Every structure is written in C-alpha cells, then in structure tokens.
Amino acid sequence: MPRRRVVGQRKILPDPKFHSELLAKFINVIMQDGKKSTAEKIIYKALDVVAEKKSESHLTILEAALDNVRPSVEVKSRRVGGSTYQVPCEVRPVRRNALAMRWLVEAARKRGEKSMALRLAGEMLDASENKGTAVKKREDVHRMAEANKAFAHYRW
C-alpha cells in the first residue's frame, strides 16, 4: 500500500465549441505531438462533414459511433502453470470509452480518404451504422472472448 494519499482522477475540461467532456477526451486521443489546436480542427471539420451527410446533430452521431465500437468484454493473458490462457474479462466503463475512441482513430488513420477529417468522418458514419473497421475490431475482441469462455474461471 502506498504511504501517500491516493491521487484522485483529474477533471477533464469540456471542449470550447460544444462543451462536451466526451469530445474533449476524443480531441486528446486524436492529438499528436501536443498539437491540440490541429486536433480540434480535425475533429470539428469531421463533425461538420458528418452533420452535412446526416440530419442528426454532431454529438448524437459521435455518441452512436462510440456506442457501436465500445467493447463489453476483452481477453487478458493469464499465466497458469506453464501455459498462458486468454481469460475473458469485463471492461470497466472508463476503459470502454478509451478503447472505443482509440479504435475509431486507428481505423480512421488506415482509411484512404484525402484528409484526416474526411477519414474520421467516414469512420464515424460507418461506425454509427454498425459497419467499418472499428466495429470489426470490437467484434473480433468479442469473438475472442467468446472462444475463450472456458477459461473464465481463471478470472482475477
């Protein structure tokens, strides 16, 4: 046990345009090399493109996309005796969001559109319709957990 006090979680400041903490977190996931203003431009442009293509609000589509990418279970490696088992575990809510955002950004970076804003917009639209690489990643993780359900009793 640490002798010092337990450090609490930092409060994240909402983004300046939509006043959303979720969007602020997403901007931080997109950001590279500390270039936050560039990340904000990319996100806001992507949200504008998404709002043009769909008649829903910006944040509704982002929320729908993240909902469809969030994993409920994942596998963790657990060494028992001489062998390593992939043990299915439930994912905590904070980690669910983090994984969903990370997978959405990774999938967007692999797409072929011209700019990152267009890639991200395309991936968000696909994810909101339960298609795309990020949703496939979630399904792969769920399939892996389902396949290793026999090792669930090794949970810790």
UniProtKB/Swiss-Prot annotation:
**Keyword Protease appears in the UniProt entry:** no
Its Gene Ontology biological processes?
Answer: translation
Its Gene Ontology molecular function terms? rRNA binding; structural constituent of ribosome; tRNA binding
- Which controlled-vocabulary keywords does the entry list? Plasmid, Ribonucleoprotein, Ribosomal protein, RNA-binding, rRNA-binding, tRNA-binding
Spans through the membrane: none
A single GO cellular-component term on record? small ribosomal subunit
Disulfide bond sites? none
- Record Pfam families: Ribosomal_S7
Matching entries from InterPro entries are given as: Ribosomal_uS7 (IPR000235), Ribosomal_uS7_bac/org-type (IPR005717), Ribosomal_uS7_CS (IPR020606), Ribosomal_uS7_dom (IPR023798), Ribosomal_uS7_dom_sf (IPR036823)
- Record has Ribosomal protein as a keyword: yes
Task: Tell me the function of this protein.
Answer: One of the primary rRNA binding proteins, it binds directly to 16S rRNA where it nucleates assembly of the head domain of the 30S subunit. Is located at the subunit interface close to the decoding center, probably blocks exit of the E-site tRNA.
Q: Which family does the entry's similarity section mention?
A: Belongs to the universal ribosomal protein uS7 family.
> What quaternary structure, including any partners, is listed in this protein's UniProt entry?
Part of the 30S ribosomal subunit. Contacts proteins S9 and S11.
Q: Check the record and name the NCBIfam families matching this protein.
A: rpsG_bact
Q: What is this protein called?
A: Small ribosomal subunit protein uS7
Native source species: Shewanella baltica (strain OS155 / ATCC BAA-1091)
Lineage summary: Bacteria, Pseudomonadati, Pseudomonadota, Gammaproteobacteria, Alteromonadales
- Give the gene that encodes this protein: rpsG
